[in-house]
Amino acid sequence: MPVTCLLSPTEYYQKVVALFQQKGDPDRAQGQMWYMRYQFEYFGIKAPEWLALAKTLFDEHGIPEGAALLETARLCYEDDHREANYFAIEMVQKVMKQQPENLIDFFEELIITKSWWDTVDWLAKLVGMHFLRFPHLTKPVTERWMASGNIWLQRAAILFQLKFKTKTDTALLFDYIRRIADSKEFFLQKGAGWALREYSKTDPEAVAKFIRETALSPLTKREGMKWMVKKGV
């Protein structure tokens, strides 16, 4: 039986921080901060460890519901430590299949908050899962993201189909990559190449043709062709 959460959002957040502080390694935290260019603080907990701690918290205290879920996640995301930010996403992911369609607004909020590839790429995956549940959201939301000028929303709009394989809306993917083809932003060039590389495993002919016929950055082309070159396709 799932545990009913009886903690307030603030109490839950305090439990998360207390446990993560207790289990953190300051020396490891220094290395983590260096790797992420000192943009975020860290408790010094590796992914398998904080995931295990998250499971402990979920098992003991349950997961908040309704507005309390988002309020708790938001408090964790406001914390300076990246592991607390990760916990927020993990908690929402655990129950996202029970959430309404407007959860997309919360995902958008997180994408543009403390934005970096680690959280944005994870959130893009969750966005894709959400769009599979609510397909009518896909085009209007991602069109708005592409028009926003925010590189992280644009990256998410390009990456949300990463694991869709035969379910990929090819026209949408190619259209969005064309729109940012002249961008000098590394994370857009790299993201576009990554999306093309993944889709090349499903339809190499379509990807090869697109790369041939589209003026893409050298980085995007190189990344997009990587799997096909390796496989000799």
What are these regions (language model features)?
Residues 2-233:
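Alpha-helical scaffold domains
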